[in-house]
């Protein structure tokens, strides 16, 4: 689940756009929540996750991180197997 600003087709910030690019390049379907359309989630999720910024990627209920971590994992070849494993589960 990607909590992001905007939608995958219309990201509303560069960080969300970069996260979507990396995830889509892995070739897996993913769910997302547009936090701009859900102000309650936008306010509460950073307190819950102890992660102050968006996007936030969760896999199997666990926070993976934001845009920088997603991009780093993608570049190191770690993101795709993790996402494929989650989709297969």
From Swiss-Prot:
Pfam families tied to this protein: Glutaredoxin
Alphabetized UniProt keyword annotations: 2Fe-2S, Iron, Iron-sulfur, Metal-binding, Redox-active center
Keyword Metal-binding carried by entry: yes
GO molecular function, one term: metal ion binding
Binding site for [2Fe-2S] cluster: 13
Binding site for glutathione: 5, 42, 54, 67-68
Domain annotation Glutaredoxin: ranges: 1-89
Superkingdom of origin: Bacteria
Keyword Iron: yes
NCBIfam families recorded: Grx4 family monothiol glutaredoxin
Family membership noted in the UniProt record: Belongs to the glutaredoxin family. Monothiol subfamily.
Name by which UniProt lists this protein: Probable monothiol glutaredoxin GrlA
Biological source species: Legionella pneumophila subsp. pneumophila (strain Philadelphia 1 / ATCC 33152 / DSM 7513)
Gene from which this protein is expressed: grlA
């Amino acid at each position: 689940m990607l909590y992001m600003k905007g939608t995958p087709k219309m990201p509303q910030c560069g960080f969300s756009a970069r996260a979507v690019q990396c995830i889509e390049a892995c070739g897996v379907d993913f769910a997302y929540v547009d936090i701009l359309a859900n102000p309650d989630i936008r306010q509460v999720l950073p307190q819950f996750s102890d992660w102050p910024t968006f996007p936030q990627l969760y896999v199997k209920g666990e926070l993976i991180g934001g845009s920088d971590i997603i991009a780093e994992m993608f570049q190191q070849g770690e993101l795709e197997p993790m996402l494929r494993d989650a989709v297969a589960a």
